[in-house]
Amino acid sequence: MKKRQSGVLMHISSLPGAYGIGSFGQSAYDFVDFLVRTKQRYWQILPLGATSYGDSPYQSFSAFAGNTHFIDLDILVEQGLLEASDLEGVDFGSDASEVDYAKIYYARRPLLEKAVKRFFEVGDVKDFEKFAQDNQSWLELFAEYMAIKEYFDNLAWTEWPDADARARKASALESYREQLADKLVYHRVTQYFFFQQWLKLKAYANDNHIEIVGDMPIYVAEDSSDMWANPHLFKTDVNGKATCIAGCPPDEFSVTGQLWGNPIYDWEAMDKDGYKWWIERLRESFKIYDIVRIDHFRGFESYWEIPAGSDTAAPGEWVKGPGYKLFAAVKEELGELNIIAEDLGFMTDEVIELRERTGFPGMKILQFAFNPEDESIDSPHLAPANSVMYTGTHDNNTVLGWYRNEIDDATREYMARYTNRKEYETVVHAMLRTVFSSVSFMAIATMQDLLELDEAARMNFPSTLGGNWSWRMTEDQLTPAVEEGLLDLTTIYRRINENLVDLKK
């Protein structure tokens, strides 16, 4: 993993296409071709999990299941599972530059239900049965959870009126399996569609020497099959409800901190069974990704624990995490893994020591590097080779939005001097050039920055609800000039993927 190369951060949902959201269809294959032509090595994406009401890929109904929004409908037509006429007149949203999650949910569900029904008439049922058998440990749990959740008007399991269902009593589960058999089939088969399409796309990328950098949230949602099945692995009360939740302490950016709301792991309980759940989670992740970025890595050293019911993150306290014991157990079971540690935020010597002991590369965000009054740990001149340098991530503004709206004149002047920006050079190009010229072995540009887009293209604004995760690229934005610019930076700063082969005809 440590050869000097580069890549692009572009989530699946942001790919162009006709059906309201990016998918595993032709535009995804075209994006791989774009990466090949520009001599990249890495395609970084956000988590692929099934998203909840806020549309965040970091709040999923399962740590293992995939987001069925990404199933490509044209592929289902090619497979005979849908008719082209089924897609005519369906309202997937009217703006090609953003995702309307409510519209695509209501538009896609009946289409996928139709495809599932048709699958048992014309599909490869034996292949599906093998998939179901191979993934039984999480698939049955997820299908049961979603079926019962839908039966109870999509309430989280902690709010279900049936106490026996909440407690997973065998008799209750058996009754719901019979009563909701069609829903169980729907969720099993759509997961099959998801993984069948994704693994084919990943194979195409890998065949062309492009590696997929996936993303793993450290926490799971309370409204998830994982917590429903394993309340003993979380800090909960007798009813299975979280007694404390995750977040970040107050800092210079937020006087009340960040209140994420995820349940906190009971690390003592996980330690007793040898971290089996984490080992399985990582094992499954490396079946679908080549490299995994683990979000909020510092939480493994110590994490901010907030009493459940708090209005802000301020009442929390730091609590020690599992430290190296977790990664030692993972290494013993799975061997060396290509992991990137998202080590942003409040850093201590202990967190740095843990990251260095694991050997995982950390992250550097160039937008954080420019402080005219003081040193920044994100400064390129301080970055070790074993790091990943970004213009920004999904949680940052675009470079153009940041430059215009988030920094003062003194910082703009310092940034111009530091990057040696020329009069004829755009701000975004100067930042991209600085990232690609850094010593970090991996340089990652966001697609929005390659397109030099403003704050309207920002992916997420942390600690806000609504309006996030919706940006999409349109087909006309990826011009030859954009391609040439990326290839030029990649060539000048010796980040060319030398393993590339000619695209298959």
From Swiss-Prot:
Protein origin, superkingdom: Bacteria
Q: Which GO terms describe its molecular function?
A: 4-alpha-glucanotransferase activity
Keyword Transferase assigned:
yes
Q: Which SUPFAM superfamilies does the protein's record reference?
A: (Trans)glycosidases
Report the locations given in the UniProt record: Cytoplasm
Q: Which reaction does it catalyse?
A: Transfers a segment of a (1->4)-alpha-D-glucan to a new position in an acceptor, which may be glucose or a (1->4)-alpha-D-glucan
Q: Which GO terms describe its cellular component?
A: cytoplasm
Which key words tag this protein in UniProt?
A: Carbohydrate metabolism, Cytoplasm, Glycosyltransferase, Transferase
A Pfam family annotated for this UniProt entry: Glyco_hydro_77
The similarity comment for this entry is: Belongs to the disproportionating enzyme family.
Q: What is this protein called?
A: 4-alpha-glucanotransferase
Q: Which organism is it from?
A: Streptococcus pneumoniae serotype 4 (strain ATCC BAA-334 / TIGR4)
* Lineage of origin: Bacteria, Bacillati, Bacillota, Bacilli, Lactobacillales
Name the gene behind this protein: malQ
